[in-house]
Amino acid sequence: MSEGRLQERLLRRFEGVIDPWQDTEQDVLPREAWAFILYFARQAKGPFLLLLIAGGLAGAVDAALYWSLGWLIDLLESTEPERLFADHWPVIAGFILLVFVVRSAVMIGSAILEQQVIVPSFFSLVRWQAFRRVIEQPYAFYQNDFAGRIATKIMQGGEAVGDFIINILQTIWSFLTFIVLTLTILVSLDPLLGVVVALWFLGYAAIIRFLLPEIRRAGRETADQRSIFNGRLVDAFTNIMAVKLFDSGRREHAYVREGLANFLAAAARLTRAITSVRAAVNLLNGAMMGAVAAIALWSWSQGGISTGAIAAAMGLVFRLNQMSGWMMFNINGLIRNYATVQDATRTISVRPAIQDAPGAITLARARGELLFDNVTFRYGEGQKVIENFSLHIRPGERVALVGPSGAGKTTIVNLALRLFDVEQGRILLDGHDIRSITQASLRAQFGVVSQEPMLMHRSIRDNIAYGRPGASEEEIIAAARRARAHEFILSVSDPRGRRGYDAHVGERGVKLSGGQRQRIAIARMILKDAPILILDEATSALDSDVEAAIQENLAALMQGKTVIAIAHRLSTIAALDRLIVIDEGRIVEEGTHAELVAAGGLYAQLWKRQSGGFLAERLAAE
């Protein structure tokens, strides 16, 4: 077995100590950063306790090393060279053991704990549990934030929690242990030396107390501006087609530059605060080292301490000077991580506005009866979109929602899916208030094809089977054939050479045309075979020949199912059982196509304005 494989096998044993997939989904994550950090630390308390011990040992070994060095110098001064090993070999062996065995064992153990046990698994544990909470947020949550910004908070939050704990338990605890032992050793040599270090520590603590809060404030602002800037970058790249079509690259320059400038200004305030702290620490350290050197030399000149004691004292304070510099950097990192965690909790620790009710039922396959009972709804604090809306859809009935843009058609569908909760009234599915049904089993009853197909950057196979995981290859292909997608799927390839059903479609399906994306979405709905179908301009991106062929399959698919169709092209829904005409969130007409045309109302006006199947929006003056 090669050395590399042996090393891999030895280290891999430590990587499974922390289970990153622990299920704590029922817990409510704390909103305050410190409580948030402790919540996750408790899930890996064993490794963190060992890290605390290792950090203390590291500080103790460092202090013992300098003390031993001073003792060794005194030993050399008092011993004839030819008698050194004969008389003092146990002491020399002990010193070598301390330097090469004990210190190495502590450092290697700390490295294994940090890099093999904690970093990969614990960081992933935080990110996984954060993702589990965020993915349960309602649709409105994602409408109010950048997707890239949310993803950044999950990634950075996981790293910040881990780094914060490691920093405290290993680096800072080791530093504090070293200070206490240094103070103890120096007091034993000369109390004045201990007084100098004690005063130095008070000054160091004062810098942390009075100067670091500015770093904390600047760090929090920097984290906010970093997230905003990252969100602007993702927004520009996600909508690159719009950027190209409107030739708005220079406008995006200004938009992104503004975000970068705000981040740069926040970062500059942070670095100014850091520079001030570093200057103060360097002045304090210089004063400490000068005072210790002067007192140690004076004490030696008076016969109070030995040469070895001077070496030990100076070695300890030089090490303290070295540690305090990078310790201030670590404390700064600690504050940055705390600010990052606090920023992340504002997203990750938000209790979902829509949750399953206690004791919510899991609905099996529904009959498809929907009842909107005096429903009122508005987005946020805005104007009511739906007001006192009532509609009964019988099982197996095919209904179309018709009306001008902004009438509330898509909102009605979103309320049925419980993407939003009604403000007043209720919605019943098979006699059950949808708020009393688990969200998962509620949405399992619906097959949806929207005007803008929702595809993942995964394989075509995965996208078709998204609503029915575990579907066989034959079932996936059959659904694709019914959606008239099989032929073009076979010709699709991606930059990594994957072809056909294995090809990845790009972010939001960007590698496919609008018609191809819509056919894959229809195939997904066909495969899911839900009892209620929602068709929101389901064939709007298709050419006439393909649309006609798919309409035949959709007609067959609709048999025995409840259908809610939304269409601006009235010709696509004229044959449905009942047309519901909506205007400003209210039902103004309902009936068959023939009945509504004969009535001469709003539907008849819309029908007359059709030109090539397109429904023009009503003029504001009408």
Language model region names:
Residues 363-622:
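ABC-type nucleotide-binding domain
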Residues 134, 256, 372-374:
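Conserved catalytic Walker-motif region of ABC-type ATPase nucleotide-binding domains
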Residues 248, 272, 319-347:
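Cytosolic ends of transmembrane helices, especially the final helix of ABC transmembrane type-1 domains
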Residues 33, 41, 110-115, 119, ...:
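Juxtamembrane loop-to-helix connectors within ABC transporter transmembrane domains
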Residues 53, 65, 118, 155-199, ...:
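Hydrophobic alpha-helical transmembrane segments of ABC transporter permease domains
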Residues 1-62, 77-95, 110-118, 132, ...:
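Membrane-integrated ABC transporters
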